[in-house]
Amino acid sequence: MSDSEDSNFSEEEDSERSSDGEEAEVEEERRSAAGSEKEEEPEEEEEEEEEEEYDEEEEEEDDDRPPKKPRHGGFILDEADVDDEYEDEDQWEDGAEDILEKAPNIDNVVLDEDRSGARRLQNLWRDQREEELGEYYMKKYAKSSVGETVYGGSDELSDDITQQQLLPGVKDPNLWTVKCKIGEERATAISLMRKFIAYQFTDTPLQIKSVVAPEHVKGYIYVEAYKQTHVKQAIEGVGNLRLGYWNQQMVPIKEMTDVLKVVKEVANLKPKSWVRLKRGIYKDDIAQVDYVEPSQNTISLKMIPRIDYDRIKARMSLKDWFAKRKKFKRPPQRLFDAEKIRSLGGDVASDGDFLIFEGNRYSRKGFLFKSFAMSAVITEGVKPTLSELEKFEDQPEGIDLEVVTESTGREREHNFQPGDNVEVCEGELINLQGKILSVDGNKITIMPKHEDLKDMLEFPAQELRKYFKMGDHVKVIAGRFEGDTGLIVRVEENFVILFSDLTMHELKVLPRDLQLCSETASGVDVGGQHEWGELVQLDPQTVGVIVRLERETFQVLNMYGKVVTVRHQAVTRKKDNRFAVALDSEQNNIHVKDIVKVIDGPHSGREGEIRHLFRSFAFLHCKKLVENGGMFVCKTRHLVLAGGSKPRDVTNFTVGGFAPMSPRISSPMHPSAGGQRGGFGSPGGGSGGMSRGRGRRDNELIGQTVRISQGPYKGYIGVVKDATESTARVELHSTCQTISVDRQRLTTVGSRRPGGMTSTYGRTPMYGSQTPMYGSGSRTPMYGSQTPLQDGSRTPHYGSQTPLHDGSRTPAQSGAWDPNNPNTPSRAEEEYEYAFDDEPTPSPQAYGGTPNPQTPGYPDPSSPQVNPQYNPQTPGTPAMYNTDQFSPYAAPSPQGSYQPSPSPQSYHQVAPSPAGYQNTHSPASYHPTPSPMAYQASPSPSPVGYSPMTPGAPSPGGYNPHTPGSGIEQNSSDWVTTDIQVKVRDTYLDTQVVGQTGVIRSVTGGMCSVYLKDSEKVVSISSEHLEPITPTKNNKVKVILGEDREATGVLLSIDGEDGIVRMDPDEQLKILNLRFLGKLLEA
């Protein structure tokens, strides 16, 4: 073929191609102007064929075009290579390339294309309706995707392929890390943005593209720019970025996408796992996952409904308006009750296994099934308590209590420890048992217990649960019983029953809250202040023993046998009763740690060890009793000593091994006279040569109020807290400081003799030829036989007066000088404060006022084990009154016999005037000069000053003698208690205070802090100078003696010497002697 023919052929092809292009364009415009509603498939195929023909012709003409034309075409094609093909189809109309080739320059082509496009758009808007325009654009632009054309029409592409076009390339800006001040990353990014805006329209705008400050990156920000110099220009002058001004690190292209990668934590919720609601009426309620819809981001929950039955009732009773105006009240959790809803007029429909009410679905068991958004629930770290689970479902149906939502990137929430036995609860190895070797966060490494598996296996924490078998000894590490230990007695599917070591209760605990252990619980609470079995005070009148320790509460067995639950703060103080002593049913001394038998009451037949004594109650521990950890309480009169008691410090034995049976003798609150008078530092003083072991504790001195007589603390007063043979620990009143003092330097308050004074036993002869002078060992019986000793143990309880009326006594006339009546002792020495050798001249007569040699003349209270306060004077008339007809030295007148008044001041009464033998006392005599008044006997004993007497003395004055023990002894301080009204006796030294009434605020040893109403001040007075005020009708009273001591009540009426009292706790009526009652201060 010749060149001319070739050129002609090419020209024909060009013309043919151009004509074809023009026809296509005309056809397109014609269809647009006519407003055709759809394009048929043959037309689409023709367009594709035309495109293919155009591509082939383009390739064939590459060699035949003039040099300039290919240059224009090459430029366009190069740009097309970079861009995607589907963008060409979207941006260029068909035949646009032909127009460009024919155009003389590219500017005209762009202008013509804009004009034609605008013209066509105007035609469309003018001629077409909105629906037709929408359909046109849908068909125009919703063509098949590039993937269908390039990759053979696949429906969808993989994510990797579709995201490739969005990845950064070499021609994109780079990310540069710049060191920033920690904590100021976000503020620095904002300041760079403001700087960019400020420089945007200046001659030197910033060349950076963006700034990124991710939340998880500390100390760095990312700056996007093409060059490092652009970054330096931008950060120059920014204070927070001066650390990174000289060094910026470029992020590799492959790692740039990780900077902005957002990983959203999606909770791994599984059916039957637990969640809590965040808001609304169900806020903080526990719920169980029924199923999850990840696509809709919803979750269906099973929960206990909260239905407002009052609102339903109000609505059904045409009170809609009122119900709406009512203040919103959150209804309680309650299972759905269809019958109750119907009874209120509600409409309940049935839908298969569910009941429908107000659009909500309820199961037949009453649970609500409702869908919530994922954002409305708390899915992480939800651990239902055992009480919630029991309330949620009585009999769990395959519920896995150990399913806990997965926690990623957070603090581990399991409590697995190396050595725990575990079991796989999900996965392919379910039910495989093993032992934990190591714990690394949520990854647990175990050694399986299987013959075919010899290697260690690693599991996530949520796939394991603890496994226990019967007989394991475990410790509770969480929950209500935290800290308790016990033996597993039963293992159920979802919880474990263990038998507590300490309280001997059965505890129901979740397996996750247990841990294997070998030790036993200490029985001390979380704060370390209280322990199991400790005696605590619940209120001023009630004590109890802690029988169960829980995290926030105690269970206390009170003195009435009831178990009460109290919070830790309600226990005010501990009671220390290590030295308490009581009497059993056979009048035996019983102490703490003694073994006793119960012979009466609800616990009759039991045997136990005394743990605590309080008043007339004893708290016992029996190992055979399961209830309350073996602790029970009963009254001391229902006990009998079973024999041997556990070893204790026995330091109170008297001469010849005699052990006093009175609990008052060894009680530190009521020290015996031996401790007061016998000399603190004299080993063997008053004990006939028998001394305690060196360094052993002296219980007699503990609790006494003493004054320091020598040394740097001379004159200080304090209470003895501990004492040995040589030293004593004294707590000073003024400084609240406890110091150690030599016992030789101590003097008890109320005594004028130094404590270290030796005994004067055995001086022969002394005054009145008494052998020995103080008669410490020659009396038989040595101590006056008081039976019974304690108030409350007598039968009958009140009165105990034999005979009750005059004339029934046998013998009717018997004086104090009757040799058959042992007038021993005649008088308690400590009624007066005097020294042994104060009398300047010896009197030829005994202290009783007659020359009759008394043996002994008066009891020597220097024996450390004898408390003369409690020695009854037998017979009723002491020798001091000089009235007996048996005196060999005097012939009394017919009226010489009288009975002393049992008032508190009786021992200070003067001797009677010429009614009988009148004795002339020496100047140093212990008795005041008698006045000429006649003595008037008083048949009614006083609350404190009455000395028990036995019949036998003549009583012309008509005095009724009483059985020993029926009254309150002269110097007894047992009646002293707080909050009662008292009167200061005339024996007190301060005359301004004598006769005033007050209220006892506190009692320390024998000293009482009394608030005096008249002078409005608080003074410390010994109990021997106080007497209680007798209450009257309707007064608030407090029992000061007897088995009901410390109990309070109201005095309803008075019948002779008795009063009818309505007790406070149970409003029980009791008849009590008025001597046993003290008047309480009324508000």
UniProtKB/Swiss-Prot annotation:
Region (10 X 8 AA approximate tandem repeats of P-[TS]-P-S-P-[QA]-[SG]-Y, motif CTR2) residue spans: 840-946
Cross-linked residues, Glycyl lysine isopeptide (Lys-Gly) (interchain with G-Cter in SUMO2): 139, 1033
Changes after translation: Methylated by PRMT1/HRMT1L2 and PRMT5/SKB1. Methylation negatively regulates interaction with P-TEFb and RNA polymerase II. Phosphorylated by CDK7 and CDK9. Phosphorylation by P-TEFb (CDK9) at Thr residues of the C-terminal repeats alleviates transcriptional pausing and promotes transcription elongation. Dephosphorylated by the INTAC complex when transcripts are unfavorably configured for transcriptional elongation, leading to premature transcription termination: dephosphorylation is mediated by the PPP2CA component of the INTAC complex. Dephosphorylated by the PNUTS-PP1 complex in termination zones downstream of poly(A) sites, thereby promoting deceleration of RNA polymerase II transcription.
Compositional bias ranges of the Polar residues kind: 757-803, 863-886
Region (Interaction with SUPT4H1): 172-266
Bias (Pro residues): 853-862
Interaction with RNA polymerase II: annotated segments: 309-416
Gene Ontology cellular component list: DSIF complex
Record key words, sorted: Acetylation, Activator, Isopeptide bond, Methylation, Nucleus, Phosphoprotein, Repeat, Repressor, Transcription, Transcription regulation, Ubl conjugation
Positions carrying Symmetric dimethylarginine: 694
Entries under SUPFAM superfamilies matching the protein: Translation proteins SH3-like domain
Residues where Asymmetric dimethylarginine is found: 677, 692, 694
GO molecular function: mRNA binding
Biological role: Component of the DRB sensitivity-inducing factor complex (DSIF complex), which regulates mRNA processing and transcription elongation by RNA polymerase II. DSIF positively regulates mRNA capping by stimulating the mRNA guanylyltransferase activity of RNGTT/CAP1A. DSIF also acts cooperatively with the negative elongation factor complex (NELF complex) to enhance transcriptional pausing at sites proximal to the promoter. Transcriptional pausing may facilitate the assembly of an elongation competent RNA polymerase II complex.
Quaternary structure note: Interacts with SUPT4H1 to form DSIF. DSIF interacts with the positive transcription elongation factor b complex (P-TEFb complex), which is composed of CDK9 and cyclin-T (CCNT1 or CCNT2). DSIF interacts with RNA polymerase II, and this interaction is reduced by phosphorylation of the C-terminal domain (CTD) of POLR2A by P-TEFb. DSIF also interacts with the NELF complex, which is composed of NELFA, NELFB, NELFD and NELFE, and this interaction occurs following prior binding of DSIF to RNA polymerase II.
Family membership: Belongs to the SPT5 family.
Name of this chain's protein: Transcription elongation factor SPT5
Organism expressing this protein natively: Pongo abelii (Sumatran orangutan)
Name of the encoding gene: SUPT5H
